[in-house]
């Protein structure tokens, strides 16, 4: 990996991490912390955005298929933004707290909705780009 690529990932990861921190905290304060809603929202929205970005790259190419876009947005920004490791830890903590149903819901719903969000983002771009100019 080049120095330039490392810097792109670093800066993107910093921005994505700050975005995750604020959005997750905001959602947690608004909805409550009885369930890890902040992490849930971040994971689903991050999945949607990465699907949208991949769709733009596949449909339009150009800047969306460049190494810079991939390193900064896909690896850095979205890698710093999404919180799969936090999701896993919170699922285990729910189990350890005796909240097996909430843990199972978190695991199943997050996996299902994140996959659907990627497909929706990707499919949405494919559909929008089919519109006559």
From Swiss-Prot:
Record keyword Cytoplasm present: no
Family: Belongs to the fluoride channel Fluc/FEX (TC 1.A.43) family.
Reaction(s) the record says it catalyses: fluoride(in) = fluoride(out)
MF terms in GO: fluoride channel activity; metal ion binding
Function, in words: Fluoride-specific ion channel. Important for reducing fluoride concentration in the cell, thus reducing its toxicity.
Top-level division of the source organism's lineage: Bacteria
Entry protein name: Fluoride-specific ion channel FluC 4
Protein's gene: fluC4
Subcellular location, record wording: Cell inner membrane
InterPro entries the UniProt entry points to: FluC (IPR003691)
Gene Ontology cellular component list: plasma membrane
Residues annotated for Na(+) binding in this entry: 79, 82
Keywords from the named record: Cell inner membrane, Cell membrane, Ion channel, Ion transport, Membrane, Metal-binding, Sodium, Transmembrane, Transmembrane helix, Transport
One Pfam family in the UniProt entry: CRCB
Main localization (coarse): membrane
Annotated control of activity: Na(+) is not transported, but it plays an essential structural role and its presence is essential for fluoride channel function.
Residue spans crossing the bilayer: 7-27, 37-57, 60-80, 107-127
GO biological process, one term: cellular detoxification of fluoride
UniProt membrane topology term: Multi-pass membrane protein
Keyword check for Ion transport: yes
